[in-house]
Swiss-Prot record:
It comes from Arabidopsis thaliana. This is 20 kDa chaperonin, chloroplastic. NCBIfam families: PRK00364.2-2 (NF001531). Belongs to the GroES chaperonin family. One of its GO terms (cellular component) is chloroplast thylakoid membrane. The gene is CPN20. Residues 159-252 are annotated as: Cpn-10 domain 2. Induction: Induced by heat treatment. Residues 60-153 are annotated as: Cpn-10 domain 1. Ubiquitous. Most abundant in leaves and inflorescence. Low levels found in roots.
Amino acid sequence: MAATQLTASPVTMSARSLASLDGLRASSVKFSSLKPGTLRQSQFRRLVVKAASVVAPKYTSIKPLGDRVLVKIKEAEEKTLGGILLPSTAQSKPQGGEVVAVGEGRTIGKNKIDITVPTGAQIIYSKYAGTEVEFNDVKHLILKEDDIVGILETEDIKDLKPLNDRVFIKVAEAEEKTAGGLLLTETTKEKPSIGTVIAVGPGSLDEEGKITPLPVSTGSTVLYSKYAGNDFKGKDGSNYIALRASDVMAILS
């Protein structure tokens, strides 16, 4: 986020200026009393700080450093699959985009670790990751490679290829009825924390920068932390979740 710097020029006063102030009495300045409840919120001007940093037009490029990547954000869906126009408040925040530039990588121990995501790749990233910037009237995001959930080469989330220590899970269907036979609505259904692993990342990096394979594999039924990861819905209506391997609590069999 761009920082705002405020500067003030030094104030100088001549002897004549000081003389002109002679005779000023404190009683000449009066303040009216303020009764409780008389101050309206509209009398204040709010300072709004946006999350996006605006890059001046004179700059022609942005080069991410270290293990960061620059992503051109995919525009939010303005319509549903049925063609219904969505108001701005109902449009979901995009979690995808195209990698347009990458940093030089990072060093772990004595090993140099390059960015594994190439430019041009279509990616899915963590929902609240990175810093948003506006460049050439287009929204971009600068984030760390570790904030990238996976690569998505199609329009269906089920084809996600997770990166690093991410595990991609198809969530088990929620119970439609209670034990007593009462039909549950979508809002009252309890979110399942069990699912089937459909894809895993290559692994996490150890202290020397070497890849350590994940302890779960494709096809495993797992129990995971209830509030972890990023939730997605496939085109067929199925629910998916992408989370870190450390959020998988157990393998069920």
